[in-house]
Amino acid sequence: MDYDRYKLFVGGIAKETSEEALKQYFSRYGAVLEAVVAKEKVTGKPRGFGFVRFANDCDVVKALRDTHFILGKPVDVRKAIRKHELYQQPFSMQFLERKVQQMNGGLREMSSNGVTSRTKKIFVGGLSSNTTEEEFKSYFERFGRTTDVVVMHDGVTNRPRGFGFVTYDSEDSVEVVMQSNFHELSDKRVEVKRAIPKEGIQSNNGNAVNIPPSYSSFQATPYVPEQNGYGMVLQFPPPVFGYHHNVQAVQYPYGYQFTAQVANVSWNNPIMQPTGFYCAPPHPTPPPTNNLGYIQYMNGFDLSGTNISGYNPLAWPVTGDAAGALIHQFVDLKLDVHSQAHQRMNGGNMGIPLQNGTYI
Protein backbone atom coordinates (compact mmCIF):
# COMPACT_ATOMS: atom_id res chain seq x y z
CA MET A 1 0.00 0.00 0.00
CA ASP A 2 1.13 3.56 -0.65
CA TYR A 3 0.27 4.25 2.97
CA ASP A 4 3.15 2.04 4.08
CA ARG A 5 5.62 3.08 1.40
CA TYR A 6 5.84 6.55 2.88
CA LYS A 7 6.27 5.47 6.50
CA LEU A 8 9.57 5.72 8.42
CA PHE A 9 10.74 4.17 11.67
CA VAL A 10 12.51 6.60 14.02
CA GLY A 11 14.56 4.88 16.73
CA GLY A 12 16.46 6.14 19.76
CA ILE A 13 14.32 9.19 20.40
CA ALA A 14 14.48 10.91 23.80
CA LYS A 15 11.69 10.11 26.25
CA GLU A 16 10.71 13.79 26.20
CA THR A 17 10.00 13.68 22.46
CA SER A 18 6.33 14.37 21.76
CA GLU A 19 4.42 13.50 18.63
CA GLU A 20 4.19 17.18 17.85
CA ALA A 21 7.97 17.56 18.13
CA LEU A 22 8.45 14.54 15.88
CA LYS A 23 6.06 15.95 13.30
CA GLN A 24 7.59 19.41 13.44
CA TYR A 25 11.11 18.06 12.96
CA PHE A 26 10.32 15.97 9.89
CA SER A 27 8.13 18.67 8.34
CA ARG A 28 11.34 20.17 6.94
CA TYR A 29 11.35 17.33 4.40
CA GLY A 30 7.73 17.64 3.35
CA ALA A 31 4.17 17.23 4.54
CA VAL A 32 3.97 14.85 7.51
CA LEU A 33 0.58 13.17 7.54
CA GLU A 34 1.14 11.26 10.76
CA ALA A 35 3.61 11.15 13.66
CA VAL A 36 3.39 8.52 16.39
CA VAL A 37 5.52 7.96 19.49
CA ALA A 38 5.30 4.34 20.68
CA LYS A 39 4.34 3.91 24.33
CA GLU A 40 3.90 1.04 26.77
CA LYS A 41 0.27 -0.05 26.92
CA VAL A 42 0.12 -0.35 30.70
CA THR A 43 2.37 2.44 31.96
CA GLY A 44 2.11 4.83 29.05
CA LYS A 45 5.86 5.37 29.16
CA PRO A 46 7.60 6.11 25.84
CA ARG A 47 9.45 3.16 24.32
CA GLY A 48 12.18 5.13 22.60
CA PHE A 49 10.94 4.93 19.04
CA GLY A 50 8.20 6.20 16.78
CA PHE A 51 6.93 6.51 13.22
CA VAL A 52 6.33 9.30 10.74
CA ARG A 53 4.36 9.09 7.52
CA PHE A 54 4.95 11.37 4.55
CA ALA A 55 2.72 12.10 1.58
CA ASN A 56 5.09 10.89 -1.15
CA ASP A 57 8.31 9.06 -1.98
CA CYS A 58 10.34 12.20 -2.63
CA ASP A 59 9.97 13.35 0.97
CA VAL A 60 10.90 9.89 2.25
CA VAL A 61 14.07 9.82 0.14
CA LYS A 62 15.10 13.27 1.36
CA ALA A 63 14.61 12.25 4.99
CA LEU A 64 16.63 9.05 4.57
CA ARG A 65 19.61 10.92 3.14
CA ASP A 66 20.25 13.02 6.24
CA THR A 67 21.72 12.52 9.68
CA HIS A 68 19.10 13.29 12.31
CA PHE A 69 19.21 14.87 15.77
CA ILE A 70 15.96 15.43 17.66
CA LEU A 71 16.06 17.40 20.92
CA GLY A 72 19.83 17.26 20.67
CA LYS A 73 19.90 13.47 20.48
CA PRO A 74 21.00 11.40 17.45
CA VAL A 75 18.23 9.16 16.14
CA ASP A 76 18.09 6.30 13.66
CA VAL A 77 15.73 6.74 10.72
CA ARG A 78 14.83 3.77 8.53
CA LYS A 79 12.13 2.51 6.19
CA ALA A 80 9.20 0.86 8.01
CA ILE A 81 7.89 -2.54 6.94
CA ARG A 82 4.60 -3.87 8.27
CA LYS A 83 4.64 -7.08 10.28
CA HIS A 84 1.98 -8.89 8.28
CA GLU A 85 3.96 -8.39 5.07
CA LEU A 86 7.06 -10.06 6.47
CA TYR A 87 5.23 -13.08 7.80
CA GLN A 88 2.77 -13.58 4.97
CA GLN A 89 2.91 -17.07 3.48
CA PRO A 90 3.82 -18.16 0.93
CA PHE A 91 6.56 -15.71 -0.05
CA SER A 92 6.42 -14.57 -3.66
CA MET A 93 9.51 -13.66 -5.66
CA GLN A 94 8.06 -10.23 -6.35
CA PHE A 95 7.43 -9.62 -2.65
CA LEU A 96 10.93 -10.67 -1.65
CA GLU A 97 12.64 -8.69 -4.38
CA ARG A 98 10.69 -5.61 -3.40
CA LYS A 99 11.53 -5.97 0.29
CA VAL A 100 15.20 -6.64 -0.38
CA GLN A 101 15.38 -3.51 -2.51
CA GLN A 102 13.58 -1.49 0.16
CA MET A 103 16.14 -2.35 2.81
CA ASN A 104 17.75 1.05 3.26
CA GLY A 105 17.89 1.81 -0.42
CA GLY A 106 18.44 -1.72 -1.67
CA LEU A 107 21.30 -4.17 -1.71
CA ARG A 108 22.80 -2.73 -4.89
CA GLU A 109 23.28 0.64 -3.23
CA MET A 110 24.56 -0.86 0.00
CA SER A 111 27.14 -3.06 -1.72
CA SER A 112 28.44 -0.26 -3.90
CA ASN A 113 31.20 0.50 -1.39
CA GLY A 114 32.70 -2.94 -2.02
CA VAL A 115 32.55 -3.96 1.64
CA THR A 116 31.02 -7.35 2.39
CA SER A 117 30.69 -9.50 5.46
CA ARG A 118 29.85 -12.92 4.07
CA THR A 119 30.40 -15.70 6.59
CA LYS A 120 29.15 -19.16 7.46
CA LYS A 121 29.26 -18.56 11.20
CA ILE A 122 26.94 -16.62 13.49
CA PHE A 123 27.21 -15.45 17.08
CA VAL A 124 24.08 -15.80 19.24
CA GLY A 125 23.93 -13.70 22.41
CA GLY A 126 21.54 -13.48 25.32
CA LEU A 127 20.91 -17.22 25.66
CA SER A 128 18.93 -18.44 28.63
CA SER A 129 20.94 -20.39 31.19
CA ASN A 130 18.47 -23.24 30.62
CA THR A 131 19.08 -23.47 26.88
CA THR A 132 20.59 -26.83 25.95
CA GLU A 133 22.87 -27.38 22.99
CA GLU A 134 20.23 -29.64 21.45
CA GLU A 135 17.57 -26.90 21.65
CA PHE A 136 20.09 -24.42 20.31
CA LYS A 137 20.89 -26.66 17.35
CA SER A 138 17.28 -27.59 16.67
CA TYR A 139 16.20 -23.95 16.37
CA PHE A 140 18.93 -22.78 14.02
CA GLU A 141 18.80 -25.88 11.80
CA ARG A 142 15.53 -24.57 10.40
CA PHE A 143 17.52 -21.95 8.49
CA GLY A 144 19.94 -24.39 6.86
CA ARG A 145 22.26 -27.32 7.38
CA THR A 146 24.66 -26.81 10.28
CA THR A 147 28.21 -28.15 10.54
CA ASP A 148 28.98 -27.05 14.09
CA VAL A 149 26.90 -25.81 17.02
CA VAL A 150 28.30 -24.84 20.41
CA VAL A 151 26.91 -23.21 23.56
CA MET A 152 29.79 -21.63 25.47
CA HIS A 153 30.42 -22.63 29.11
CA ASP A 154 32.83 -21.39 31.74
CA GLY A 155 35.97 -23.50 31.79
CA VAL A 156 36.07 -23.63 35.60
CA THR A 157 32.46 -23.68 36.80
CA ASN A 158 30.91 -25.11 33.60
CA ARG A 159 28.15 -22.52 33.91
CA PRO A 160 26.69 -21.29 30.61
CA ARG A 161 28.08 -17.95 29.46
CA GLY A 162 24.93 -16.79 27.73
CA PHE A 163 26.15 -17.03 24.15
CA GLY A 164 27.08 -19.54 21.49
CA PHE A 165 28.07 -20.04 17.87
CA VAL A 166 26.46 -21.77 14.90
CA THR A 167 28.31 -22.68 11.72
CA TYR A 168 26.38 -23.44 8.52
CA ASP A 169 27.55 -25.22 5.41
CA SER A 170 26.47 -22.24 3.32
CA GLU A 171 26.86 -18.48 3.65
CA ASP A 172 23.36 -18.12 2.22
CA SER A 173 21.91 -19.74 5.36
CA VAL A 174 23.47 -16.97 7.44
CA GLU A 175 21.83 -14.35 5.20
CA VAL A 176 18.47 -16.00 5.84
CA VAL A 177 19.00 -16.03 9.62
CA MET A 178 20.02 -12.37 9.53
CA GLN A 179 16.73 -11.28 8.01
CA SER A 180 15.87 -10.75 11.66
CA ASN A 181 18.60 -10.07 14.18
CA PHE A 182 16.25 -10.97 17.04
CA HIS A 183 14.90 -14.50 17.54
CA GLU A 184 13.06 -16.29 20.33
CA LEU A 185 14.71 -19.35 21.84
CA SER A 186 13.64 -21.11 25.07
CA ASP A 187 11.09 -18.35 25.73
CA LYS A 188 13.81 -15.69 25.62
CA ARG A 189 14.69 -13.19 22.95
CA VAL A 190 18.22 -13.67 21.65
CA GLU A 191 20.30 -11.59 19.27
CA VAL A 192 22.18 -12.90 16.26
CA LYS A 193 25.33 -11.38 14.71
CA ARG A 194 27.61 -12.46 11.92
CA ALA A 195 30.82 -13.96 13.33
CA ILE A 196 33.63 -12.67 11.13
CA PRO A 197 37.07 -14.37 11.21
CA LYS A 198 39.72 -12.02 12.56
CA GLU A 199 41.51 -11.92 9.25
CA GLY A 200 38.28 -10.61 7.73
CA ILE A 201 38.51 -7.34 9.66
CA GLN A 202 40.93 -4.83 8.27
CA SER A 203 41.29 -1.15 7.53
CA ASN A 204 39.60 0.07 4.37
CA ASN A 205 42.51 2.30 3.45
CA GLY A 206 45.38 1.10 5.65
CA ASN A 207 45.86 4.53 7.18
CA ALA A 208 46.91 4.80 10.79
CA VAL A 209 44.54 6.61 13.13
CA ASN A 210 45.73 8.57 16.15
CA ILE A 211 43.88 7.90 19.38
CA PRO A 212 44.48 9.19 22.90
CA PRO A 213 47.30 7.53 24.92
CA SER A 214 44.77 6.14 27.38
CA TYR A 215 43.47 3.98 24.55
CA SER A 216 46.83 2.53 23.60
CA SER A 217 45.49 -0.94 24.27
CA PHE A 218 42.86 -0.46 21.59
CA GLN A 219 43.15 -0.78 17.86
CA ALA A 220 41.36 1.85 15.77
CA THR A 221 39.93 0.65 12.49
CA PRO A 222 38.07 2.72 9.88
CA TYR A 223 34.60 1.38 9.40
CA VAL A 224 33.10 2.30 6.05
CA PRO A 225 33.96 4.78 3.26
CA GLU A 226 33.68 8.44 4.22
CA GLN A 227 30.73 9.10 1.94
CA ASN A 228 28.55 7.05 4.28
CA GLY A 229 29.18 9.51 7.07
CA TYR A 230 30.24 6.97 9.67
CA GLY A 231 33.24 7.11 11.94
CA MET A 232 35.56 4.46 13.30
CA VAL A 233 35.26 1.70 15.85
CA LEU A 234 37.54 0.95 18.76
CA GLN A 235 38.67 -2.64 19.10
CA PHE A 236 40.35 -4.65 21.78
CA PRO A 237 43.52 -6.32 20.49
CA PRO A 238 43.15 -10.02 19.54
CA PRO A 239 44.88 -11.42 22.68
CA VAL A 240 42.05 -10.22 24.92
CA PHE A 241 39.27 -12.57 23.89
CA GLY A 242 39.91 -13.63 20.32
CA TYR A 243 36.91 -11.62 19.21
CA HIS A 244 36.21 -7.99 19.74
CA HIS A 245 34.04 -6.51 22.43
CA ASN A 246 33.25 -2.84 22.21
CA VAL A 247 33.70 -0.19 24.83
CA GLN A 248 31.24 0.28 27.65
CA ALA A 249 27.78 1.13 26.39
CA VAL A 250 25.10 3.40 27.80
CA GLN A 251 21.65 2.18 26.89
CA TYR A 252 19.09 4.31 25.21
CA PRO A 253 15.45 3.38 25.77
CA TYR A 254 14.39 0.29 23.85
CA GLY A 255 17.87 -1.12 23.51
CA TYR A 256 19.86 1.53 21.68
CA GLN A 257 23.43 1.95 22.81
CA PHE A 258 25.95 4.73 22.76
CA THR A 259 29.55 3.76 23.32
CA ALA A 260 31.41 5.43 26.16
CA GLN A 261 35.17 5.48 26.58
CA VAL A 262 35.49 2.71 29.17
CA ALA A 263 36.53 -0.90 28.56
CA ASN A 264 33.84 -3.44 29.32
CA VAL A 265 33.57 -7.21 29.59
CA SER A 266 30.01 -8.39 29.30
CA TRP A 267 27.76 -11.42 28.90
CA ASN A 268 28.48 -11.84 32.64
CA ASN A 269 31.74 -13.58 31.86
CA PRO A 270 34.87 -12.29 33.64
CA ILE A 271 37.09 -14.74 31.76
CA MET A 272 36.36 -15.89 28.22
CA GLN A 273 38.28 -18.33 26.08
CA PRO A 274 39.43 -17.20 22.62
CA THR A 275 37.04 -18.02 19.82
CA GLY A 276 38.90 -16.51 16.90
CA PHE A 277 35.86 -14.65 15.63
CA TYR A 278 34.50 -11.12 15.71
CA CYS A 279 30.81 -10.41 16.04
CA ALA A 280 29.43 -8.04 13.44
CA PRO A 281 25.98 -6.44 13.39
CA PRO A 282 23.90 -6.77 10.24
CA HIS A 283 23.90 -3.11 9.24
CA PRO A 284 26.10 0.00 9.46
CA THR A 285 25.93 1.95 12.68
CA PRO A 286 24.30 5.39 12.70
CA PRO A 287 26.50 8.49 12.58
CA PRO A 288 28.77 9.34 15.51
CA THR A 289 28.15 12.17 17.95
CA ASN A 290 31.87 12.53 18.63
CA ASN A 291 35.09 11.05 17.33
CA LEU A 292 35.08 7.99 19.56
CA GLY A 293 31.43 7.23 20.16
CA TYR A 294 28.54 6.19 18.03
CA ILE A 295 25.15 4.65 18.40
CA GLN A 296 26.03 1.04 18.13
CA TYR A 297 23.17 -1.27 17.48
CA MET A 298 19.77 -2.28 18.76
CA ASN A 299 20.64 -4.86 21.39
CA GLY A 300 17.06 -5.21 22.54
CA PHE A 301 17.90 -7.51 25.45
CA ASP A 302 16.39 -7.17 28.89
CA LEU A 303 17.06 -3.83 30.52
CA SER A 304 17.43 -5.25 34.03
CA GLY A 305 20.96 -3.95 34.45
CA THR A 306 22.77 -6.87 32.88
CA ASN A 307 25.73 -5.54 30.90
CA ILE A 308 25.36 -6.23 27.23
CA SER A 309 28.15 -5.04 24.98
CA GLY A 310 28.19 -4.37 21.27
CA TYR A 311 30.53 -5.67 18.65
CA ASN A 312 32.79 -4.14 16.06
CA PRO A 313 30.49 -3.37 13.15
CA LEU A 314 30.96 -4.62 9.63
CA ALA A 315 28.62 -3.45 6.91
CA TRP A 316 25.72 -5.75 6.06
CA PRO A 317 25.83 -5.47 2.24
CA VAL A 318 25.23 -8.56 0.17
CA THR A 319 26.34 -8.83 -3.46
CA GLY A 320 23.86 -9.15 -6.29
CA ASP A 321 24.44 -12.90 -6.64
CA ALA A 322 24.07 -13.40 -2.91
CA ALA A 323 20.86 -11.40 -2.94
CA GLY A 324 19.45 -13.77 -5.53
CA ALA A 325 20.46 -16.76 -3.46
CA LEU A 326 18.90 -15.18 -0.41
CA ILE A 327 15.60 -14.73 -2.20
CA HIS A 328 15.57 -18.38 -3.27
CA GLN A 329 16.28 -19.41 0.31
CA PHE A 330 13.34 -17.34 1.45
CA VAL A 331 10.96 -19.04 -0.96
CA ASP A 332 11.44 -22.39 0.79
CA LEU A 333 11.75 -21.04 4.29
CA LYS A 334 8.81 -20.44 6.60
CA LEU A 335 10.08 -18.17 9.32
CA ASP A 336 8.70 -18.95 12.71
CA VAL A 337 9.73 -15.96 14.76
CA HIS A 338 6.34 -14.29 15.08
CA SER A 339 6.01 -14.95 18.79
CA GLN A 340 4.39 -13.76 21.96
CA ALA A 341 7.73 -12.26 22.97
CA HIS A 342 7.67 -10.06 19.89
CA GLN A 343 4.10 -9.07 20.63
CA ARG A 344 4.95 -8.19 24.21
CA MET A 345 7.93 -6.18 23.08
CA ASN A 346 5.92 -4.27 20.54
CA GLY A 347 2.64 -3.61 22.30
CA GLY A 348 0.77 -6.14 20.22
CA ASN A 349 0.90 -4.45 16.84
CA MET A 350 3.87 -2.08 16.72
CA GLY A 351 6.25 -4.57 15.11
CA ILE A 352 9.93 -5.32 15.62
CA PRO A 353 13.16 -3.69 14.42
CA LEU A 354 14.96 -5.69 11.75
CA GLN A 355 18.44 -5.64 10.23
CA ASN A 356 19.21 -2.52 8.31
CA GLY A 357 16.92 -0.68 10.69
CA THR A 358 13.77 -1.68 8.84
CA TYR A 359 10.76 -2.12 11.04
CA ILE A 360 7.93 -4.62 10.93
From Swiss-Prot:
GO terms for molecular function: mRNA binding; single-stranded RNA binding. Keywords: Coiled coil, Repeat, RNA-binding. It comes from the Eukaryota. Highly expressed in inflorescences and roots. Detected in leaves and seedlings, but not in stems. Expressed in vegetative shoot apex and root meristem, but not in root cap. Detected in flower buds, junction of pedicels, joints of immature siliques and pistil. Residues 6-82, 120-197 form the RRM domain. The keyword Repeat applies. It holds the Pfam family RRM_1. The keyword Chaperone does not apply. PANTHER family: RNA-BINDING PROTEIN MUSASHI HOMOLOG RBP6 (PTHR48032), RRM DOMAIN-CONTAINING PROTEIN (PTHR48032:SF12). RNA binding protein. Can also bind in vitro to single-stranded DNA. This is RNA-binding protein 1. The lineage of its organism: Eukaryota, Viridiplantae, Streptophyta, Embryophyta, Tracheophyta.
